[in-house]
Amino acid sequence: MGYRIVVAGATGNVGREMLNILAEREFPLADIAVVASSRSQGDEVDFGETGRKLKVQNIDNFDPTGWDMALFAIGSDATKIHAPRFAAAGCTVIDNSSLYRMDPDVPLIVPEVNPDAIDGYKKRNIIANPNCSTAQLVVALKPLHDAATIKRVVVSTYQSVSGAGKSGMDELFEQSRAIFVGDSVEPATFTKQIAFNVIPHIDVFLDDGSTKEEWKMVVETKKILDPKIKLTATCVRVPVFVGHSEAVTIEFENELSAEAAQDILREAPGIMLVDKREDGGYVTPVESAGDSATYISRVREDPTVENGLNLWCVSDNLRKGAALNAVQIAELLGRRHLQKG
C-alpha cells in the first residue's frame, strides 16, 4: 500500500535529491515515475542508494491520470505549462518553483511551521514550496515567535552556488581551477567572478533597489509565519558549493533571554542547536551538507535594541531548502488527505 508519485525534473540537482530523500525516508510508494524535458528522455537516474534505476520519461507526453502526487523541480516556465495539467488530472502538484508561492489559492507550506495551511490545497490542487533561504529562516523563527512574538527581523544571507543549479556549481569549480593555474575567468551564470569572491546580488533588481530574492524572503515569511512581522533582507552569493547560511537579528514584543531561546530551539522540530561559546562550537555549511536539520548557533542577546537576539542559521539548501521540504509536504498531504492505493 502506498502512493503513486511522479518526480518532475529528476535529472537536476533538486530532482535527484528528491529521489534520494524519498528512498532514505522509505516513503510509502505504490509506484514512482521520473520525468524531465525531451533532452533527458531515456536517461536513467538512481533511486537513492537502493540500487534501483529509473528511466526518465518525457514530461510533454506523460499522462498524470491515476497518479497521486507530483514533486516538481522544473522551473517556473515549465511549471506554468505542466502544473495545471497535472492538477486537473487529479495529481496534486508540490511545486518547488516561485510561480505559485504568492497565489492566495495555493498554500505555501513548511510542515514544521504551518502544517494546517495545507488544508486549502484543493482550490488549485497545487501546493507551493518556499524559497530555499526562506525555508530555513521560518523553521528557526517559528518557535521563537510562538514564545515572544517577533516584531522585526534583519537577515543577511550567505547563499551557496548550488542555489543557482548545476551551472552555478560548475562555474565555481571551473573558475577556482582557472585562477589556480593563472587563467582568466569569464562570468556566465553569475554577474561577476564567484571564485574567491562574494556577490551581493541574487535574482533581478527591483525598483526599490532590493533584489527579487530579498523580496521573496520578505513576502514568503509573512505568508508562512505572520503578515505582521517586519523583515528586511540582504542576499549574498558566496563561493560555497552546498549550504546556505544566515545571520539573523530578531526584535521581539516580549523579553526572551538567549538562554531561554536556546532551550526553546533545542526542543523545536527540524532544528539542531549547536551553540558552544568556544572555538568550533558552531555549525558551518560544510557540516550541514547532506543533512536534513536546520542548524542554529551563536544565539546571543542584542544590546542595541530592546528584546533583541542574534543567531546564526545554516542548512543544506538542496534538502530543507528544496527537496526535503517537498517530501515532507508529500508526507503531510498523505497523512491528512490522501488514501494509499
Over which residues does each language-model region extend?
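A glycine-rich, Thr/Ser-enriched phosphate-binding loop motif common to dinucleotide/cofactor-binding enzymes
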Residues: 125-136, 209-218, 321-325
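N-terminal Rossmann-like NAD(P) cofactor-binding subdomain of oxidoreductases
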Residues: 1-194, 230, 258, 263, ...
